[in-house]
Amino acid sequence: MKSRSLRVATIGLGAALGLLCGCADTREGPSGPFAAGSTGGDDASTGLSEDTATILDVGQGTMGGVDPDSVRGCDKVDFLFVVDNSGSMADEQQALIDSFPQFISAIDARIGASHDFQMMVVDVDAWVFGECSPACSEAAACDAAANCGVTEECGFPCALRDLCEQGDFACGQTQPESCEDVLGAGVTHPRGRGASATACDFATGARYMDANEPDLAGAFACAAKVGTGSSADTEQPMDAMVQALSSGSAAATCNTGFLRDDAILVVTFITDEDDDPTDSTGSPQGWFQAVADSKHGDDEAVVVLGLFGDNDQPQGLCTPLSHDFATGAEPAPRLREFVQMWGGRGHVGSVCAHDYAPFFSSAVDSIGQACDEFVPPG
């Protein structure tokens, strides 16, 4: 069993303990029209191949030569984004944020102008500061004995306390906000190291955004920058997804209004590690069934997009996850199996890609087709 709190605590030691060279991902930053300072050439500046750029000619209002006004199905889509907030995910979160405006513009063009979108972001732990209070107590005892940075026993709690404090956690003072400590609850105020550290204040007044958000791209960027300071022992992306979608769960109560019977569901998750049996409970088959159950058994009303490690695949982009957890990714056979269970409505991409726009563009037609064919229950 891996211990992620040990991992992030080790990252938190930094140069002070001389255990790591740093915690930032050293890959190139994301490219594309929404990356800061992007001035690339023709294909690089759009983040799309020539063929894909033709398909996504949003300015002409067409998708693959099809006039969206001539193909009308559902006009409601619920988007759930499950975003890993562990110590190695800073660049991946930024790549997701950079690709979002183009993705939503393409969806809008494919489905039509009378759209009704809702978007919610969840991270992969119950509370970013969940293990901080115990670390504070243990580190205080180490301080009293002058052992922080000296003994092996004190290395972990002292480092974890430092990590928590880097994310503006105050020992003995910081408490979770409403629903903030519920796994699968929509993120409204990302906290911890590297997070937006801003109350997103969605116009809906809920834990999700909708298409009427005055600055939708800005609101999504606020929520999706969940940071890299999670103190939890394990990453639980599939548990977070299941809890967010399961009727009667604590998260569902927090997320009231997000999941609608008359909308299709698009789940996107992004992580650089597999979801091992010691992390999320259940199996790919169980996760599939839980998501299908959230749509009253209609699995054709669901599209699933997964960005994760591909270094176990031919021509994969990822290098092995490095010991300092700053680069690469872990192969993710369980997550891959889950996505592939959705057939043509499951799309797999590399979390190590510098630009996620081509991946999202490849899924637009699947989302549009699911919407075209959707028949709401009742």
Across the structure, where does each feature detected by a protein language model lie?
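Sec-dependent bacterial lipoprotein signal peptides
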Residues: 1-22, 241
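Small/flexible residues
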Residues: 4-9, 29, 120, 193-195
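Divalent cation-coordinating acidic motifs and surrounding scaffolds
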Residues: 24-25, 55-378
